[in-house]
Amino acid sequence: MTNIRKTHPLTKIINNSFIDLPAPSNISAWWNFGSLLGICLILQILTGLFLAMHYTSDTATAFSSVTHICRDVNYGWIIRYMHANGASMFFVCLFLHVGRGLYYGSYMFPETWNIGIILLFTVMATAFMGYVLPWGQMSFWGATVITNLLSAIPYIGTNLVEWIWGGFSVDKATLTRFFAFHFILPFVISALAAVHLLFLHETGSNNPSGIPSDSDKIPFHPYYTIKDILGALFLILTLTLLVLFSPDLLGDPDNYIPANPLNTPPHIKPEWYFLFAYAILRSIPNKLGGVLALVFSILVLAIIPLLHTSKQRSMMFRPLSQCLFWLLVADLLTLTWIGGQPVEHPFITIGQLASILYFMILLVFMPIVSIIENNLLKW
């Protein structure tokens, strides 16, 4: 008799995705981040659900409801800080996951890659709206500045912004709808993640060498389940240390001041994981140009498969491309630093140079260096 695990319609899906899934024998710890992102998503949905039980999406009471959660709700403080820092862990895993995809040529699975880009945009939108909910100074002014960017869209811009706001400024209507969207989007993300996985399992996983691994597969369980559990333990340990020892390390102190439309904070900046994009936005003096650069800084990932000129899929055996990749990482760290600095000399110039370099590496240097490497192989 065949095992029920392999025959029952429900368990069969789980079996084919997480148990009997044929996986390459040589995938490294860089392939852990998919499962870690799944864990982050589950954690965020659960902590968010418990926070939503006590939160009120009204401008008069939003700030005090968050204070109430931290002070009066049983273990409310740990739920709130796990949710806030869980978002940071989510983005750490996301950036490493995307970086892995760039390094090892995982973008050569176009459907999986494109759904991944949609997921990245959706997660960024969710995180932005979540940051508005505590209704502190940075929440309010962040919402005002970022939504205002849409007014740069010709002809319909102003109407669009007022439609999103639900009035003539960020107010009660804005907060209520942001809460509604922030609640529903994680479930959209879950559905997209399932589709992401569906397309991945159509082709099978890539591996560090970039060479097809059909001749050498091993079952996902127990080999990679145990490996993923180790990664999950590291993730939970890091998150726990962050939550229990320095929960406000990655936050902004200004967000402990209730939102005041009459008082602008000295430096309006988003959470750390958006700073690289914020730096690119600010480095262009024109409003519409800045918005386009901001969107394109993520959307550029969609055209990377078209710019793949190398004969090899992975960067494992391409030292020149590796140098460029790590230059890109350094450039993104520079942009993140610049995004948190005030708009003054020398930060403006550094930000502009780093922004130009970011697009140049991805759109110009990578394809050219790949062609050079192809020619070096002939020698």
Curated annotation (Swiss-Prot):
Spans traversing the lipid bilayer: 33-53, 77-98, 113-133, 178-198, 226-246, 288-308, 320-340, 347-367
Role according to the record: Component of the ubiquinol-cytochrome c reductase complex (complex III or cytochrome b-c1 complex) that is part of the mitochondrial respiratory chain. The b-c1 complex mediates electron transfer from ubiquinol to cytochrome c. Contributes to the generation of a proton gradient across the mitochondrial membrane that is then used for ATP synthesis.
One Gene Ontology molecular-function label: ubiquinol-cytochrome-c reductase activity
A GO term from the CC aspect: mitochondrial inner membrane
Cofactors, names only: heme b
Xref: PROSITE patterns: CYTB_CTER, CYTB_NTER
Name of the featured protein: Cytochrome b
Signal peptide: none
The protein's assembly and partners: The cytochrome bc1 complex contains 11 subunits: 3 respiratory subunits (MT-CYB, CYC1 and UQCRFS1), 2 core proteins (UQCRC1 and UQCRC2) and 6 low-molecular weight proteins (UQCRH/QCR6, UQCRB/QCR7, UQCRQ/QCR8, UQCR10/QCR9, UQCR11/QCR10 and a cleavage product of UQCRFS1). This cytochrome bc1 complex then forms a dimer.
GO biological process, one term: mitochondrial electron transport, ubiquinol to cytochrome c
Entry keyword Heme: yes
PANTHER family from the UniProt entry: CYTOCHROME B (PTHR19271:SF16)
Recorded superkingdom: Eukaryota
Intracellular or extracellular location(s): Mitochondrion inner membrane
Membrane-topology descriptor: Multi-pass membrane protein
Cofactor note: Binds 2 heme b groups non-covalently.
Organism annotation: Neovison vison
Residues bound to a ubiquinone: H201
Additional note from the record: Heme 1 (or BL or b562) is low-potential and absorbs at about 562 nm, and heme 2 (or BH or b566) is high-potential and absorbs at about 566 nm.
Protein family (similarity comment): Belongs to the cytochrome b family.
Keywords, alphabetical: Electron transport, Heme, Iron, Membrane, Metal-binding, Mitochondrion, Mitochondrion inner membrane, Respiratory chain, Transmembrane, Transmembrane helix, Transport, Ubiquinone
Binding site for heme b b562: H83, H182
Binding site for heme b b566: H97, H196
